[in-house]
């Protein structure tokens, strides 16, 4: 989490307006989705390109979990990872645990408010090398919101698994509650800065079977 807030978010804000003049279908789709969301929330009329980028910056500062912001963050971070400016931070226990679980034939997947593109870049360019082959699937807010139980049902269906056969790990109690309501097993990850507040907790991936 600290890597996201201390490195990725500042990098996004620093480079955001460099993309204002970029003409691509991908950027246009993000701006169209931004305008649609502004209209739904505020009833605002059509905004120009600069105003839309300013709104994306405002959402970033508010840490809004909205799809167009997450999509643009993924694009900007992708360039940072590809140029080597960014390297994905993972705790020392993560890579060995992923290798162990993968060798045991367990299906590993990620669900994050960050876009699928950003997830793949972070784990594909980590300080421990490319960890992305360990994962069978990646999910983001296009699947649903992280505090909605139906999202976890959809994820289990996508993995062709019963929720009862899935273990969901998170540091956020509200997300754990949603996954539990969907029928998943849950464990809270208690890293530095996180307060233990769940019936099943782990401070290290090595503590998880």
What are these regions (language model features)?
Residues 100, 107, 125-145:
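Surface-exposed, interaction-prone regions with an acidic/low-complexity signature
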Residues 78, 82, 115-117, 173-175, ...:
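Short, solvent-exposed loop/turn segments at secondary-structure junctions
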């Amino acid at each position: 989490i600290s890597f996201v807030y201390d490195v990725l978010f500042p990098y996004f804000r620093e480079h955001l307006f460099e993309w204002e003049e970029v003409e691509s279908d991908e950027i246009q789709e993000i701006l169209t989705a931004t305008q649609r969301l502004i209209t739904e929330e505020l009833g605002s009329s059509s905004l120009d390109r600069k105003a839309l980028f300013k709104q994306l910056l405002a959402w970033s500062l508010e840490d809004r979990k909205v799809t167009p912001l997450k999509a643009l963050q993924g694009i900007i971070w992708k360039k940072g990872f590809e140029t080597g400016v960014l390297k994905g931070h993972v705790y020392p226990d993560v890579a060995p645990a992923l290798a162990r679980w993968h060798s045991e034939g367990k299906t590993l997947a990620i669900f994050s408010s960050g876009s699928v593109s950003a997830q793949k870049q972070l784990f594909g360019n980590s300080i421990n090398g490319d960890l992305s082959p360990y994962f069978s699937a990646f999910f983001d807010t296009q699947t649903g919101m992280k505090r909605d139980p139906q999202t976890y049902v959809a994820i289990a269906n996508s993995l062709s698994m019963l929720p009862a056969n899935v273990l969901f790990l998170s540091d956020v109690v509200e997300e754990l509650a949603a996954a539990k309501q969907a029928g998943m097993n849950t464990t809270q990850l208690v890293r530095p800065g996180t307060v233990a507040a769940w019936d099943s907790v782990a401070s290290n991936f090595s503590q998880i079977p």
